[in-house]
Amino acid sequence: MQRLSLGVPELDQAILGGIPKGSLVLVLGPPGAGKSILGKLFLHTGLVAGVQTFMVSTAEADQAIAETMAMFRWTAGVPERVHVLDCYSWRLGGKRSKYSVPLTSLTEVSVSLSKLFDDYKIHPEGNERLVVDSFTDFVKYVGVDKSLKFLDYLRQKLRENGVTGMLMLEEGVHAPRTIAAVEYSTDGTIRMKVSEQGRFMMASRMQATPLAQKWIQFTIGK
């Protein structure tokens, strides 16, 4: 089974080298635990490997994403191979690109995602990566039921195209049954937490991967 590296050696080792290709993994943790940075590191690791990467962004525009990655010196390939589906700018009353869509219309989100994949000629033999940051905003703006239906569509879309994905979800915001439903519709879960001792992560479940569930301290540096 082909696996794609997260970019965090300790966690890659714990999950036999990375996330299984074509799977969609939930990243669950409280604010400040490092979910968004992990997502950008996942994309950066793909850029280093020379593949196209995609971000479905609900919390920041493409310029902010590029600036954050530049802070960590993850700049190689960013303008050419980080493609942002902007689900954020509509809140400000603007449309920054042809890939800007309102989060309140999941039909438009789905159509634009398909257009992105078509425009960049994504095919199952590739090793492309996608991050959704954050699925919490989907639930906030369109509700649990519609968000879960979109999640099922997204999972199938990634699988058909051989794209490996991460889905960020805020812990402490959603009802336990919502988190359970999201876990049911994804292929694995990476949990994150933060304390005075630092940041920690753990793979609590992963498709086709035996796991020793153990918290791993990590630092994402420059």
Label the predicted regions.
Residues 59-63, 88-92, 135-137, 171-175, ...:
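Conserved nucleotide-binding/hydrolysis micro-motifs of P-loop NTPases
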Residues 6-18:
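Pre-Walker A adenine-sensing motif
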Residues 91-159:
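Phosphate-binding/switch loop-helix module in NTP-utilizing enzymes
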Residues 52, 81, 125-129, 160-168:
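Loop/turn-to-beta-strand initiation segments
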Residues 25-28:
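Short hydrophobic/aromatic beta-strand immediately N-terminal to the Walker A/P-loop
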Residues 30-101:
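Conserved P-loop
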Residues 163-164, 168-222:
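Phosphate-binding/switch region of NTP-binding enzymes
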